[in-house]
Amino acid sequence: MEYTFAQYQESAQALRDRLGAFRPRCLLILGSGLGSLGNEVESPIAVPYEDVPHMKRSTAPDHAGRFVFGRLAGQDVAVMQGRLHTYEGWSFEDVSYPVRVLRLLGAETLVVTNAAGAVNTAFSAGDIMLITDHIKLFGVSPFAAPIWRSSAPGSRT
């Protein structure tokens, strides 16, 4: 599905209405095994994905399917407890939709976590890895989206 800028704005406004003056500076997308980190957020405001217009729902097992807004480690954050996946039938634009909406709310930093395997024998279970690149074997890029000016989702201007 191709979303319009008005749809992104409508989603962002629905979140503003729930959050009052709170604005997250960082979006944390929690992957498998880390969903409980959302329970550590101070002064949490939980918003189920189904309460956000145009947002798809996570159907993966053990994914709560909600945002948690508040403070974590002294930072104003939005936490996604349960991400969206293409294997659930969602498009790349569906999967990246919440990132663009949160950018409209003011999030400037994105941290994505996941459970991953490695072929490097120097790695041990529980090691932290920094992803610096990716291999895209699909025909469509998850970065593909309409280009908008100014503070629009994904804009660098």
What is each model feature region?
Residues 1-157:
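Metabolite-binding pocket within alpha/beta catalytic cores that recognizes anionic/polar moieties
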